[in-house]
Amino acid sequence: MMIHSKRRTFLKAGLIASVGLAVVNQLQSQAVAQPANPAELGTFDLKKLNNADAVLIAALAPVILAGTLPQAADARKVAISEVVDAFDRTIAGLSPLVEGEIRELFSLLHFSLTRKYLAGVAKPWDEASEAEIAAFLSRWREHRFALFQGAYQALAKLMIACWYGNPLSWGAIEYGGPPYGKELGL
C-alpha cells in the first residue's frame, strides 16, 4: 500500500510539473521581450536567433568578454555585433539536439519570471546593468547544481569562441592569424 501511495504522489507531482512547464512555455512564447531599441544593436541577418536572443547575447558579451572588447564606443558596438553574428552562425552549425538545448536556455532567460527567479535579474536584459549580469553569471558559475554550471559554461565558452574566432580580437592578443597556403609553402 505504501509503494502505491508514493507512486501516485510521484505521478501527480510529475503531471503538475508538466502542466506548469507547458503553461510557462506558452506564456513565454507569447511574451518574449523584444529589444527596447533594436537599432542600437545594428542590423543582423539572423538565421537561428531572434531579436530577443540578440539582445541577450549583446547584454552578456561585455561581461563575459570583460577587458577584451575595444573601449571606444563605435568599435565596441561593432565588436558586440560581430559576437552576436558569430553566435548565430555557431548555433546554426550545432546539432538539432544542442540547438534545442540552447533554445530552451534562452527561453528560460527571456521569460520574466524565470529570468527573475533563476537568473536573479529582474529587468529585461537590455536594461540590466553589467553588475547585475556579472552577479547572475557568477551565481550560475558557482551554483551547487551542475545544470546551472553547465548552462554558464555553455554561454561562456560559446561567447569566448565567437569573439576569439574573429580577426577583430587578434590584435589585442598579438595573434597574427592562422597560417595560409603561401605561408605554409603550398
Can you say where each PLM-predicted feature lies in the sequence?
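Generic recognition of stable, solvent-exposed alpha-helical segments in well-folded globular domains
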Residues: 9, 14, 52-55, 150
